[in-house]
């Protein structure tokens, strides 16, 4: 089993899975993550992840896997993003949007043998997010995906991760309940 996790591995795996068919490449960025569709200067779509962080790459890939074709033609998939410092209602909306991508991210992490941590992303907000409640929602989504089937793009990437990192097929036992994650 591969023990080292380096962002270049993810770039190579992602590009081998999706560069040709989806004209999309994974790019190490020097700043905040962003998705950029092809334009006059760059003939391919770019998933730019933050600072060479392995976890950031997996998270941004998960958002790409959620986005449909029309969303993949827009900067940052056309999503609204409210930065850190959200109030309770805005935090709730943020978490609603994040459940599905973070479920994919958890699947990717397990397939890569890499630790997963949910991200509520509100360190400076006036509300303390309930990480356990949010992780329960992400966990429930993971269980649904395992039972009903993982869509093609994330499933393809999971297979590539499993092959490279020599990890087993994903089952429910790989995703313990939040109380078990101490």
Regions found by a protein language model. Give the residues of each.
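Short helix/loop segments within enzyme catalytic domains
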Residues: 107-122
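Auxiliary, metal-adjacent structural segments of Zn-dependent hydrolase domains
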Residues: 1-41, 91-96
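Amphipathic alpha-helical core segments of compact helical bundles
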Residues: 63, 106-109, 139
């Amino acid at each position: 089993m591969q023990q080292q996790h380096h962002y270049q591995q993810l770039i190579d795996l992602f590009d081998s899975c999706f560069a040709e068919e989806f004209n999309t490449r994974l790019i190490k960025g020097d700043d905040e993550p962003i998705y950029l569709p092809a334009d006059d200067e760059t003939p391919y779509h770019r998933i730019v992840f933050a600072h060479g962080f392995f976890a950031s790459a997996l998270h941004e890939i998960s958002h790409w896997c959620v986005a449909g074709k029309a969303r993949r033609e827009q900067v940052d998939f056309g999503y609204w993003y409210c930065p850190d410092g959200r109030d309770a209602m805005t935090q709730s909306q943020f978490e609603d949007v994040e459940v599905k991508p973070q479920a994919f991210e958890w699947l990717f992490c397990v397939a890569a043998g890499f630790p997963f941590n949910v991200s509520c992303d509100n360190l400076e907000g006036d509300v303390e997010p309930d990480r356990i409640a949010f992780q329960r929602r992400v966990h429930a989504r993971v269980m649904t995906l395992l039972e009903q089937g993982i869509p093609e793009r994330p499933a393809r990437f999971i297979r590539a991760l499993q092959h490279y990192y020599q990890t087993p097929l994903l089952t429910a036992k790989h995703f313990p309940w939040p109380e078990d994650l101490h």
